Curated annotation (Swiss-Prot):
Subcellular location: Cytoplasm
UniProtKB keywords: ATP-binding, Cytoplasm, NAD, Nucleotide-binding, Nucleotidyltransferase, Pyridine nucleotide biosynthesis, Transferase
Protein known as: Nicotinamide-nucleotide adenylyltransferase
Cellular component terms per the entry's GO annotation: cytoplasm
EC number per UniProt: 2.7.7.1
Tree of life domain: Archaea
Coiled coil: none
Pfam family, one: CTP_transf_like
Species assigned in the record: Pyrobaculum arsenaticum (strain DSM 13514 / JCM 11321 / PZ6)
GO terms of biological process kind: NAD biosynthetic process
Taxonomic lineage: Archaea, Thermoproteota, Thermoprotei, Thermoproteales, Thermoproteaceae
InterPro entries: Cyt_trans-like (IPR004821), NMN_Atrans_arc (IPR006418), Rossmann-like_a/b/a_fold (IPR014729)
Chief location bin: cytoplasm
GO molecular function terms listed in the Swiss-Prot or TrEMBL record: ATP binding; nicotinamide-nucleotide adenylyltransferase activity
Gene3D superfamilies (UniProt xref): HUPs (3.40.50.620)
Amino acid sequence: MVRGLFPGRFQPPHWGHIYAVKEILKEVDEVIIAMGSAQFNYLLKDPFTAGERIWMLREGLREGGVDLSRVVIIPIPNVENNLEWLGRVKSYTPPFDVIYTGNPFVALLFREAGYEVRQQPMFQRERYSSTRVRELLLRGDPSWEELVPKSVAEIIKKLRGAERIKTAASGEAEPHKW
């Protein structure tokens, strides 16, 4: 069995993520989604909890026609030391053969650790970006819904995600500044 690792924050998951997983599954038997920054939530850059992101991603993948029996989602907390983070990823996940990333620094870390690194499949990256989704939610622009699966949009609305992001933007949601 060939396993691929696909790290990301998925804040929130969008159609580009769904596309990437579908493309990765054309090359591997199973994809491990390493959901980074698992300990962060209710922040402008990280508004959703790890559990909420897992929920959104599973529903979005299901809506996108992905066989969830071939997908493992594992939350990975961040650490400040990059080599410690690499070790944490390796200890939290089942063994994997190849990593898919669009981040040159992540690619460097894994390549130096002896892993095969492949370019993450991209789908209209300038359009499909979690940063863009959060910015549109912050502005109250309803076009954010076009960028995510309908199931993800419904979850974001249920969680009052726009309100959460607007509150986080006020700066009151940063505990390290208290």
